[in-house]
Curated annotation (Swiss-Prot):
Disulfide bonds: none annotated. Belongs to the peptidase A24 family. The keyword Protease applies. It comes from Methanococcus maripaludis (strain DSM 14266 / JCM 13030 / NBRC 101832 / S2 / LL). The chain crosses the membrane at residues 1-21, 31-51, 56-76, 77-97, 101-121, 128-148, 149-169, 182-202, 206-226, 321-341. This is Prepilin peptidase EppA. GO terms for cellular component: plasma membrane. It is an enzyme of class 3 (hydrolase). The gene is eppA.
């Protein structure tokens, strides 16, 4: 007779292999095979019921409902996978949804959001790092002055300027060039600071704080760059578009039959969506953030192209398979449950 630890370890490993298989097919073909979900259900439901009783069943249905509610941007295969895993994690639940499944969904979404940021950093690091160094230097100077001379209520104004500065650098090239050049003098700032006030430099960890600020400002810059149009996209022929593709363009069909195509960043698309919900837009708009293109959308675009109302290609956002991020998050959850991470950290 298997003990709890051996049996649960075996099931964890079995599910890992299934998710690994789904990761391969998701990368290659953007599908999750049915046999993966079926095998998960065949194993996880009985094992979950054996250990956790009826809680495993309620967790199954509660997770299904949660995934359907959060389903914008989540494919049907992802919903099935999270649901099929849920009976295995029914030991602790929040409103009948396993706590570990909630963390698994959250971590998967977080990893999926962070990964595209690495692409933006790869493309724009020559702007982001120097300007972040300049802003970190500015923060260090102002913070030290306010602390030495006991000046209060400056943080809100300072960080407001920092965020505004990053936005301005995206819109005004000359300002961005100046910010970048100022970033290269930060070594002089650090050396000069140490020579002027070595006691404060050491006691307040100015050097460490400087690099922490650079990290924080780089992350803020990545988010602002993404919001202001640095999303990774490519042009694609309308005839090559597939169901699920997310177009960056806003296609608007006006009441007089005129069609406009606007290459819009995420802020413009969000604003357009809000205006649409408020009924402030003229005509009908096609936006695919979240769920992607449907068969009806593809038919409409091909019709508009055949009628000569739009060009032959649109800007399509680069998206990534979701299951690889689920695999990483699953490894984190299982290692935590097995105490491996706590052992390594502790």
């Amino acid at each position: 007779m298997f003990g709890f630890d051996n049996l649960i370890l075996g099931v964890y490993l079995f599910n890992f292999l299934l998710i690994l298989t789904a990761t391969y097919t998701d990368i290659k073909e953007r599908i999750i095979p049915h046999f993966v979900i079926i095998l998960m259900l065949i194993v996880n439901l009985p094992i979950g019921y054996y250990f956790f009783g009826f809680d495993a069943i309620t967790s199954f249905f509660a997770t299904l409902i949660l995934c359907l509610i959060l389903g914008v941007g989540m494919g049907g295969g992802d919903v099935k996978m999270f649901t099929a895993l849920s009976p295995l994690f029914a030991a602790e639940t929040i409103y009948f949804v396993p706590k570990d499944i909630s963390i698994l969904i959250g971590l998967s979404a977080l990893f999926a959001a962070i990964f595209p940021m690495t692409k933006i950093l790869k493309n724009y690091w020559k702007d982001i790092i120097p300007s972040s160094a300049y802003l970190a230097m500015l923060i260090g100077i102002i913070v030290s002055i306010t602390e030495i001379y006991s000046i209060g209520n400056t943080k809100t104004i300072l960080w407001s300027y920092i965020i505004l500065s990053i936005f301005i650098s995206r819109k005004i090239p000359k300002y961005r060039i100046i910010s970048n050049k100022l970033g290269y003098i930060t070594p002089i700032y650090l050396i000069g600071f140490y020579l002027l006030n070595p006691a404060y430099f050491v006691s307040e960890n100015v050097l460490i704080s400087f690099f922490v600020y650079i990290g924080q400002l780089s992350l803020i810059s990545l988010v602002i760059y993404a919001l202001t149009g640095a999303e990774i996209s490519s042009k694609k022929q309308i005839s090559d578009l597939k169901e699920g593709d997310i177009i960056r363009d806003i296609v608007t069909i006006k009441e007089n039959g005129e069609v406009t195509v606007e290459n819009a960043n995420i802020l413009k698309r969000f604003k357009h969506m809000i205006y649409g919900e408020m009924g402030k837009l003229e005509g009908k708009s096609l936006m695919t953030d979240g769920e992607g293109l449907s068969d009806e959308n593809l038919e409409l675009l091909n019709k508009l192209q055949n009628e000569g109302k739009i060009g032959g290609e649109l800007n399509v956002l680069t998206t990534y398979p979701f299951v690889p991020f689920v695999l990483v998050a699953y490894c984190v959850i299982t290692l935590l449950n097995m105490g491996v991470i706590n052992y390594l950290v502790g």
